Structures are given as C-alpha cells and as structure tokens.
C-alpha cells in the first residue's frame, strides 16, 4: 500500500476513514523473541481479559507504545486489555488526545461514563481545547489543575499526570524490567530539539545557548545531532538534562522518564511538584534563573552523585515501569471505577488543534 505520507488530501480522508473502520490496515504486527503478537494488531472475537478497552488515538504510534509498554507486548495490564477493534461491545473506550490521526471527526457508540479522554498535551491555554474533553458525562484525565478544579456538570475531570508514551527509548517493558545499566563512561548529555513555536520552547533554547558557551556536553535531537534511539544518548551517560517546555505540577514527560529507565540521573527543570511523584534523591533540580546554575551543573557532573544515588534512580525507574506507565495507570483507574455504566449513545468526537495564537 502507498504510504499515507504520499497521499493527496482527498485520498488521505478516504484512507483515514478506512483506517478507523479497519485499523489493522495501518497496524504493524509487533513480535520479538518470546513475545506474543500485540492485541492491538488484530480484530478480537473473544475477550482476552475481564475488561476490554478499545483505543482511538491521534498519536500515530499507539500500537508501538502498546507493544513497548505492556508485558510481552500483549496489550494487557492486570485485568484490562487495550485493543483497537472488536466484534463485540467493549467495556471502555479510550481516546488518546483525539480520535483521528488525520484530524477527521469520528462518531462512536459508547457508554459516556466508560469513555475516557486521556490527554497528554501540556496544560497551556494553547492546548486547552484538548483538556476540555468532549461529550456529556464522559471522563477527562487531564494534567490541567485549573480545569480539573472546576465543577463541570458536563463531564468528570480527573487530575492526573499526562497520558503519553511514558518512555521513548527503544526498549520494551520486559527488557527494562531486568536490565541494569552499570557501565556509564560518559558525563552529560541533553536530548532536545530546535522547535521554537511557543514561549516554553524559546525559554529552553535560550538556556541551551547559555549552557553551550560554558559547559562541555553532548547534544542530541532534531536540529542538532539526530539519533535513532534515545537509549544511545542516555544509557552511556551518568547525567542528562531533562528540560520541560511547560512548568506545571502534574506535567512531566518522557524527557524525565527516559532518563530514569536508562538509569541516568536527570538534571531537571519542569514540574515544581515532581518530588511528589519520584524520590527527591533520584534527580537534581535546577533553576535556569539562578546565576550560579551552570557552575552547579559543572559541580554535579564532576561528582559521583549518580553512583551514590543509584538506589533512588532505580526506584524512580520502577515507578515509571509500574505506576506512571500509561497502561498501568489507565488499568488502575479503570479498575477503580465503581459506578454503573450509562446506556450507550453516539458520542461525536472532533479533533482539537493547538492554538498557536495563544503563546503560553
């Protein structure tokens, strides 16, 4: 089949509609030695677990995430199976950011209080349309604390960490569970990009330029030195800078969690409340506004702090794998719901867009 990147506008719409009706058209069947085929890659006719959740997404990499983040790439966590299509009515529907990779509106027939909008975008005004969710009596998992605090009769808002890929290094849950990264001959790396669309991007780039003038480190990412697997820019390093584009209590991303799964100590700027989620000894917090921040980083990378705090870093790694792993988190939430499902109805789902006119 022709790559979707080569299709014209009209053909893309037809292809997108076919993908929604038949997601196996665009799914790869992921296998590795000793692993099962991902449940997301086939039409299910029987229940693989007591609870079945059908997934819709605008990620474009959800199936790869299911393969990497669940045991044996199975798509199952505890009592919940995360799938694409079924020949029976699933118990839950989960919408990851929005329902269509191509920005098309989608209608689903689902129980509203068994429909989750799982949002991974930053909690900025530019991204507010994602966090507001859609439908009546649906559930929105959002890291936007201001929005979650509001009383809203239309839908249930639940404050949560962002629902993202969790880690982006090319290692599976099973591989990371047994791996130990002992040999770290290199000092400091930073994986970032030259994207400068929003204020947070530009703030990060300004700090990067300061750092490059005064400190020796290895820089990777789009616009700098491309790398196929982030593991290779983290695992050999004792320290790596993890700099979020948005600063909010519940917002932390793979920038931080990639460090932990590679057992690298993050030098971190981001969530002011990050030590609620991970051990304080597992990272070093920095303030870009501190006039001594660069000498502080130099002192850190010259030290054996990584070795001294290896236990805390490994505990943070465990938390990424078992608690903040997207599918572990969603399974825990789903299993905690006690109310009865509402009757199914048609829920119309549009595709929100980032409002780049709001630069915050």
Regions found by a protein language model. Give the residues of each.
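Pol beta-like nucleotidyltransferase catalytic core
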Residues: 11-119, 130-223, 230-360
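Canonical radical SAM enzyme core domain
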Residues: 122-125
């Amino acid at each position: 089949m022709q790559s979707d990147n080569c299709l014209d506008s009209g053909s893309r719409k037809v292809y997108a509609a076919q993908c929604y009706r038949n997601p196996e058209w665009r799914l790869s069947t992921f296998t590795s030695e000793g692993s099962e085929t991902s449940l997301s890659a086939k039409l299910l006719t029987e229940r693989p677990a007591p609870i079945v959740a059908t997934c819709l997404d605008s990620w474009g990499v959800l199936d790869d995430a299911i393969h990497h983040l669940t045991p044996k790439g199975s798509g199952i966590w505890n009592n919940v199976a995360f799938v694409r299509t079924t020949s029976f009515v699933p118990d839950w529907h989960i919408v990851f950011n929005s329902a269509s990779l191509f920005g098309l509106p989608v209608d689903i027939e689902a129980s509203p209080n068994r429909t989750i909008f799982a949002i991974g975008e930053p909690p900025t005004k530019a991204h507010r349309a994602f966090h507001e969710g859609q439908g009546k009596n649906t559930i929105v998992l959002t890291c936007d604390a201001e929005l979650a605090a509001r009383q809203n009769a239309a839908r249930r808002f639940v404050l949560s960490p962002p629902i993202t890929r969790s880690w982006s290094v090319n290692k599976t849950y099973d591989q990371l569970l047994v791996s130990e990264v002992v040999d770290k001959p290199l000092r400091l790396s930073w994986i970032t990009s030259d994207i400068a669309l929003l204020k947070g991007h530009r703030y990060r780039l300004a700090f990067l330029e300061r750092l490059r003038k005064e400190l020796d480190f290895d820089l990777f990412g789009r616009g700098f030195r491309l790398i196929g697997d982030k593991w290779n820019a983290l695992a050999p390093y004792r320290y790596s800078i993890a700099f979020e584009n948005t600063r909010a209590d519940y917002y932390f991303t793979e920038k931080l969690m990639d460090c932990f799964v590679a057992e690298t100590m993050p030098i971190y700027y981001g969530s002011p409340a990050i030590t609620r989620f991970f051990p304080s000894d597992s990272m070093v917090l920095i303030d870009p506004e501190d006039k001594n921040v660069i000498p502080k980083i130099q002192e850190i990378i010259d030290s054996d702090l990584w070795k001294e705090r290896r236990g805390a870093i490994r505990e943070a790694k465990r938390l990424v794998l078992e608690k903040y792993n997207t599918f572990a988190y969603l399974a825990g939430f789903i299993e905690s719901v006690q109310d009865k499902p509402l009757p199914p109805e048609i829920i119309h789902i549009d595709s929100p867009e980032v409002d780049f006119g709001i630069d915050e």
